[in-house]
């Protein structure tokens, strides 16, 4: 941990939040002289204070320890670049249309990668909608967690649960991409 980098980061974040050293110190329960010492690179925050700093500045503790924030390159959030993330502990599903650092349950998440396997499915067009029926058991050990249909400007996300019928209704499928995530078999691009 480089105290100079950490101090510079705390200074920039404090200024962003429009806080004085005294106001920040009062929120954490320390003296303003301590904040001044950190910002000059003459010391680093105690481990017990990192959680408070993280909450006040709304950044990860790791970023405070690293002493720098990296901003993403703005790519316009094109839906062609959509990434899906699934937490292995709680099953939370997250998406992003640009590169992003995502964590859940205290762990950094990587975007799902498409596997070569396909789940067999049938598609019927009914009343301007597409009914997709999957050949899947939908047991607690092996079920489809979600189906997503991505078009150029939007996406449709349907969450499925164990013991539920393995079928979903979507707007009539045209030129988008159809994704499916099975707990056992992984993330698939359906064709």
Segments predicted by a language model, with ranges:
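A short, Lys/Arg-rich alpha-helix, primarily the initiator
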Residues: 1-16
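Short alpha-helical DNA-recognition segment
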Residues: 18-36
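Residues immediately within or flanking Cys/His clusters that coordinate Zn2+
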Residues: 82-84, 101, 179
């Amino acid at each position: 941990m480089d105290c100079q980098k950490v101090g510079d980061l705390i200074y920039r974040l404090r200024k962003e939040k429009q806080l004085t050293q005294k106001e920040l110190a009062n929120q954490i329960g320390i003296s303003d002289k301590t904040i001044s010492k950190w910002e000059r690179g003459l010391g680093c925050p105690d481990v017990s204070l990192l959680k408070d700093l993280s909450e006040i500045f709304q950044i990860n503790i790791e970023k405070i320890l690293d002493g720098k924030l990296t901003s993403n390159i703005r790519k316009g959030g094109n839906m062609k670049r959509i990434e899906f993330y699934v937490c292995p502990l709680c099953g939370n599903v997250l998406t992003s249309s640009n590169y992003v650092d995502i964590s859940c349950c205290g762990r950094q998440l990587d975007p799902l990668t498409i596997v070569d396997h396909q789940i067999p499915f049938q598609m019927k067009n009914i009343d301007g909608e597409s009914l997709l029926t999957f050949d899947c058991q939908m047991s607690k050990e092996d079920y489809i967690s979600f189906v997503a249909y991505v078009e150029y400007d939007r996406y449709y996300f349907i969450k499925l649960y164990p013991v539920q019928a393995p079928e979903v209704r979507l707007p009539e499928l045209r030129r988008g991409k159809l994704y499916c995530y099975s707990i056992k078999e992984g993330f698939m691009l359906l064709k």
